[in-house]
A protein has these predicted regions:
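Conserved active-site-proximal phosphate/metal-binding subdomains
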Residues: 1-117
């Protein structure tokens, strides 16, 4: 719930590329976690898969405590996300999203068909 709320409130400027979770650069929501790893005084992340081995237990604890409303954990909470996160501004069911894709597809095919007439 914490990360979902952050995603719905985020825009492209709220994302960063960071090696802090996996050891490979991944786009994530900016958080106190990514800021700490980006600090000039921070250690360099380990190579993959070692960074994941290091960060996974910590992220699991952060996620668990964030779901209970722990303020510090909420600030640290992050997840992988693309720059298009700004397009996600309200919660939708998967069913609704699939139907919207289908409607958009039908409209696109109709427009294309009209250009071929």
């Amino acid at each position: 719930p914490t990360v979902k709320k952050k995603m719905l409130e985020a825009n492209a400027r709220n994302t960063v590329r960071s090696r802090s979770r996996t050891g490979k650069p991944t786009r994530q929501l900016q958080s106190a976690w990514t800021d700490a790893w980006a600090s000039p005084n921070a250690l360099q992340p380990l190579e993959m898969p070692l960074q994941g081995v290091l960060s996974r237990p910590a992220m699991d604890k952060i996620d668990k405590r964030a779901s209970l409303g722990h303020e510090g954990a909420v600030a640290l909470s992050t997840y992988y996300v693309g720059q298009a996160v700004g397009l996600m501004n309200k919660e939708k069911s998967v069913k609704t999203i699939v139907y919207e894709f289908m409607e958009d597809y039908v409209e696109a095919v109709e427009r294309l068909s009209n250009t071929l007439k």
